[in-house]
From Swiss-Prot:
Subcellular compartments: Cytoplasm
InterPro entries cross-referenced by the UniProt entry: CsrA, CsrA_sf
Physiological role: A key translational regulator that binds mRNA to regulate translation initiation and/or mRNA stability. Mediates global changes in gene expression, shifting from rapid growth to stress survival by linking envelope stress, the stringent response and the catabolite repression systems. Usually binds in the 5'-UTR; binding at or near the Shine-Dalgarno sequence prevents ribosome-binding, repressing translation, binding elsewhere in the 5'-UTR can activate translation and/or stabilize the mRNA. Its function is antagonized by small RNA(s).
Signal peptide: none
Similarity comment: Belongs to the CsrA/RsmA family.
This protein's name: Translational regulator CsrA
Alphabetical keyword list: Activator, Cytoplasm, Repressor, RNA-binding, Translation regulation
Species this chain originates from: Xanthomonas campestris pv. campestris (strain B100)
GO molecular function annotations of the record: mRNA 5'-UTR binding
Length: 70
């Protein structure tokens, strides 16, 4: 596993198409923003595991900016 240190506002690249930006840090929570093409699926791990198990239907679209408050 690659481990990186980033500050708020700093970004890392995954390949040529995906960027991950640190949006904020509060206590032990880190908010990140991910910019990826629509054909690249981005899920929280627990949601991804549900999808893999077929436990429950998951909305087909990702929610962007669903919680922009700090």
């Amino acid at each position: 596993m690659l481990i990186l240190t980033r500050r708020v506002g700093e970004t890392l690249m995954i390949g040529d198409l995906v960027t991950v930006t640190v949006i904020g840090v509060k206590g032990n929570q880190v908010r990140i923003g991910i910019a990826a093409p629509k054909h690249v699926a981005v899920h929280r791990e627990e949601i991804y595991q549900r999808i893999q198990r077929g436990d429950e239907p998951v909305a087909s679209g990702a929610h962007h900016n669903d919680d922009c408050s700090d």
